[in-house]
């Protein structure tokens, strides 16, 4: 028997507070302002701890993806905290619309709400693919533009903060600068400004200039890149505060931006036409959108580089990275993007990589862990460690595995190997691989 779950209606926009599970903290802080400008009352959740995972396990099958356990557990924990009026609260979950099980989280959440005794709490879907067309929450074009601006600004703030914080003379200066700019950009977004390409291109150099002004002392440090399943990659709840741990080990950390994943999802819609046929209008539309995003992204990266910071290549160059390694048709979960990000990190000097993945995430095991040996063969300096996250995995074991990777990185710090790919003849002759160590 099919249960008639409550829908989020347009009328609830004025009466209900929408709770949003946290993931990429800075980007989501700005996204909250974009939603508030559009008339939504919302709150990004910050509740963490083992109780969240245990609550998720109570209402969701333990074989379900780890991110689903955490997201549903976090939302239920917030509801049961007593902080919110359960008759005036709604929940929201992002959906990519792809083949990954993440597209089904929303149905698992609705079932969990019924089991937990909250059958009347509505759940809305945040997506760009037209799922749940009858929902009162719709991703309109103006809201989408403000959301995109929030991601661009958040990516830049995170990238610059992570390159300044390990070297700052006054501890906490980079974090204060992030807070300052989030507040400043939040006011701009609430005023209905700051989201056009012209405004973003004007703002990027100002952000870079302020971070450049922070006094630092540059000393050699281990540089670590983080890739993986999108939730576990960014969420401190999902990866046991991985960034904080790496920084406690005196590392500079690089998280490839969230906008790369957004562009990856858009690119895949057009790539489907190339691989399988279909409507040419879809391909033309996605190409046009990607061109617009590319223009903004290049301005952001130029502002970073002009201020003396490391800036990766734009998405259009990232698409070329996995050529000869994995097909662009591999697009379940993070797909070819994860492989491309690892190559980009190695080439950019972040050859020590943590690949964070949920234990049962099949796409990640293929495009992440499955590509490690091939990348090591091409780039012998690559020092990649896949780390599994699930309710039964202990934080101590995860951190000990990372420490082993960092021990190798610290040995190489004084005598770094150039991230130079081997020739085809060298690869054919048997490239070095740590899998045989």
Feature annotation, model-predicted:
Residues 1-437:
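An N-terminal assembly and electron-transfer interface module characteristic of large anaerobic redox
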């Amino acid at each position: 028997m099919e249960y008639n779950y409550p829908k989020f209606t347009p009328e609830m926009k004025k009466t209900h507070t929408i709770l949003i599970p946290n993931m990429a903290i800075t980007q989501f802080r700005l996204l909250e302002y974009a939603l508030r400008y559009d008339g939504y009352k919302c709150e990004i959740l910050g509740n963490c701890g083992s109780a969240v995972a245990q609550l998720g396990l109570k209402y969701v099958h333990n074989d379900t993806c780890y991110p689903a356990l955490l997201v549903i557990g976090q939302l239920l924990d917030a509801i049961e905290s007593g902080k919110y009026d359960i008759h005036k609260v709604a929940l929201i979950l992002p959906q990519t619309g792809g083949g990954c099980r993440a597209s089904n989280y929303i149905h698992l959440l609705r079932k969990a709400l019924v089991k937990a005794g909250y059958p009347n709490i509505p759940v809305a879907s945040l997506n760009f693919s037209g799922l749940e067309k009858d929902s009162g929450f719709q991703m309109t074009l103006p809201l989408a533009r403000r959301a995109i601006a929030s991601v661009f600004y958040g990516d830049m703030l995170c990238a610059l903060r992570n390159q300044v914080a390990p070297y700052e003379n006054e501890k906490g200066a980079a974090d204060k600068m992030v807070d300052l700019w989030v507040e400043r950009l939040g006011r701009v977004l609430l005023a209905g400004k700051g989201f056009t390409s012209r405004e973003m291109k004007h703002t990027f150099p100002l952000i870079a200039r302020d971070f450049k002004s922070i006094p630092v002392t540059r000393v050699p440090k281990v540089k670590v890149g983080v890739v993986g399943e999108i939730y576990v990659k960014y969420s401190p709840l999902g990866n046991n505060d991985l960034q904080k741990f790496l920084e406690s080990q005196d590392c500079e950390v690089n998280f490839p931006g969230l906008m790369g994943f957004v562009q990856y999802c858009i690119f895949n819609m057009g790539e489907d036409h190339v691989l399988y046929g279909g409507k040419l209008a879809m391909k033309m539309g996605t190409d046009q959108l990607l061109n617009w995003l590319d223009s903004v992204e290049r301005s952001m990266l130029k502002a970073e580089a002009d201020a003396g910071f490391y800036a990766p290549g734009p998405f259009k160059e990232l698409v070329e990275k996995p050529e000869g390694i994995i097909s662009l048709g591999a697009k379940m979960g993070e797909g070819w993007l994860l492989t491309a990000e690892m190559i980009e990190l190695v080439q950019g000097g972040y050859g020590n990589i943590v690949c964070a993945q949920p234990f049962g995430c099949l796409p990640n095991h293929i495009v992440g862990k499955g590509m490690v040996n091939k990348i090591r063969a091409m780039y012998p300096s690559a020092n990649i460690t896949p780390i599994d996250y699930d309710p039964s995995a202990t934080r101590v074991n995860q951190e000990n595995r990372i420490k082993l990777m960092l021990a190798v990185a610290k040995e190489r710090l004084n005598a770094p190997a150039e991230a130079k790919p081997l020739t085809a003849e060298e690869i054919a002759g048997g490239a070095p691989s740590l899998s045989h160590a």
